[in-house]
Amino acid sequence: MSIAELKAGEWAKVLAIEGGYGFRQKLLLRGIFEGRLVRVISNRGPVTIEIDRNIVSLGRGMAKRIRVRRI
């Protein structure tokens, strides 16, 4: 499942990132990488997530390429 499929308030662990080096670097700069725990704040329009008390907004296309497991 992807981050884009989660509902507001749900927690997930990042399992994989589907994309090339540039895409992975862009996410890494935002604190998103394999093994990271994230919480969805909002899933309306851009997907807004919380990572270690930081808020990050992702476009739906980006969010669909981040594979997660709900926890």
Say what each PLM segment does.
Residues M1-I71:
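Compact, glycine-rich, soluble single-domain proteins
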